[in-house]
Design a protein with these regions (language model features):
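N-terminal anchoring/stem segment of glycosyltransferases
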Residues: 2-79, 141
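Residues that flank catalytic or metal-binding motifs in active/ligand-binding sites
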Residues: 14, 64, 83, 130-133, ...
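Short coil/turn segments at secondary-structure boundaries
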Residues: 31-32, 94-95, 148-149
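A structural signal for short, well-ordered beta-strand segments and their strand-loop junctions
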Residues: 49-50, 81-82, 106-107, 136
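Catalytic core and acceptor-binding pocket of nucleotide-sugar-dependent glycosyltransferases
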Residues: 59-62, 66, 137-175
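The conserved acidic donor/metal-binding loop of glycosyltransferases
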Residues: 84-88
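Conserved donor-nucleotide/metal-binding helix-loop-beta segment in metal-dependent transferases, i.e.
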Residues: 89-128
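A recurrent flexible, glycine/aromatic-enriched loop bordering the glycosyltransferase active site
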Residues: 122-137, 156-159
Length: 175
């Protein structure tokens, strides 16, 4: 059993709070990612919260959904940015200068290998879809309700990609 230090948290800016977390399975990469998150947060004077609990009520991937709900309910910041434990920040640009601040959610999109097969060997179909490893959320009632709905999609608790599948379902995609 691994034991971690208490959650790391900084509080003095109400514009943006960076959220992240990892458990013992992601400890090595999480520690490295944490360094870049703190450096980025300090550079722009953003708040951050890095949760390192050793157990969670669901698969640990769901932690981001729970942290969004808890932080949106508190309402202390205008935006919340989730960064997975394998995220590294290389460019020190203020993310809030690159988004339309009227929108509710910004999510990283990427190509996924489709389950559908082509007739040509070694050629795969690709599907475009969201990846919830990096999400920027504006603090609105709509955002809070959205993440509550994602949390309540219990049919994805045993899915191989549980949090992302529930998120995609809430957007109307097939997971």
């Amino acid at each position: 059993m691994f034991f971690f230090n208490k959650n790391k948290e900084k509080s003095n800016n109400s514009k943006l709070k960076i959220l992240s977390g990892y458990n013992y399975r992601y400890k090595d990469i999480g520690k490295e990612s944490e360094k870049t998150i703190i450096k980025y947060a300090d550079y722009f004077n953003f708040d951050y919260e890095i949760d390192k609990r050793s157990s969670f009520e669901r698969h640990f991937y769901w932690l981001k959904i729970k942290m969004f709900i808890e932080n949106l309910e508190k309402g202390t910041h205008e935006f919340y940015l989730w960064l997975d434990a394998d995220t590294f920040i290389c460019r020190y640009e203020n993310i809030l200068n690159h988004v339309d601040k009227k929108k509710h959610i910004f999510v990283h999109n990427q190509f996924f290998k489709s389950k559908h097969k082509t007739k040509i060997s070694n050629i795969d179909y690709l599907t475009w879809g969201p990846n919830v490893g990096v999400i920027l959320v504006r603090n609105t009632k709509w955002s809070l309700e959205f993440f509550r709905n994602v949390w309540n999609k219990k049919k994805y608790l045993n899915h191989y990609w549980p949090d992302n599948a529930a998120f995609m379902d809430e957007l109307g995609y097939k997971a």
